[in-house]
Amino acid sequence: MIITWMEEFGVLFVKAFLSLLAIMNPFSSVPVVISLMNEYSKEEIRVIALKASVYAFFILTFFLISGDLLFRFMGITLPAFKVGGGILLFLIALNLVQGEVTKEKGKAHEIEAALRRDNIALIPLAMPLLAGPGSITTVLVLRGYLNTLEGKVALFCAIFLSSFTAFVVYSLSTFFYRVLGRTGINLITRISGILLLAISVQFVVDGLKNLLKH
């Protein structure tokens, strides 16, 4: 029984983690991170990266915990949200495949405002770069899919590991940019977009199936 539970947990965790990592895609934000923190020391960059990942973790965890309450309060059914969320993720994925990251990853005025406020860990690094509309939608839709105890735990662990991955990438942003270059980052972004396209289509298909049953 324990082995079966672990196998089920592992499958759910991998599905949730890959979905979240595809939409968060911290590698695509590396050029933005470098431009924001080019005058900071390595220690300061690590501190800011840690704060940004912690902020993103708590934002996404909040929506994981409060998902049912939000749906009831707004009068939204899960199938309807699957369709709407899937369409939103599909549009975001198209931008990723086409290499148009900045449209979803933060506007120029948000970056300038962050520099003026010296609060880049929260805006734009944590939100919208990591915990933007796409990530929040993914958490809410996955929450409906993984509607068991092991599913909820798997999604929580996926949020934690995705946030930790973002911390590592942001902390080593200069290294990754030097190793991967613009071409490598664009390639990772497009691969993430293709994966997200498949996930978003599945969300829409499942949502439509559930709606047509009623």
UniProtKB/Swiss-Prot annotation:
Annotated keywords: Cell membrane, Membrane, Transmembrane, Transmembrane helix
GO cellular component terms listed in the entry, alphabetical order: plasma membrane
Superkingdom, taxonomy of origin: Bacteria
Protein topology in the membrane: Multi-pass membrane protein
Locations listed in the record: Cell membrane
Transmembrane regions listed in the UniProt entry: 17-37, 47-67, 73-93, 122-142, 153-173, 185-205
The keyword Membrane belongs to this UniProt entry's keyword annotation: yes
Pfam families assigned to the protein according to its UniProt record, in alphabetical order: MarC
The keyword Repeat is assigned to this record: no
InterPro entries named among the record's database cross-references: Multi_antbiot-R_MarC (IPR002771)
Family, as annotated: Belongs to the UPF0056 (MarC) family.
NCBIfam families to which the protein is assigned, alphabetical: NAAT family transporter
Protein name: UPF0056 membrane protein aq_540
Organism (species): Aquifex aeolicus (strain VF5)
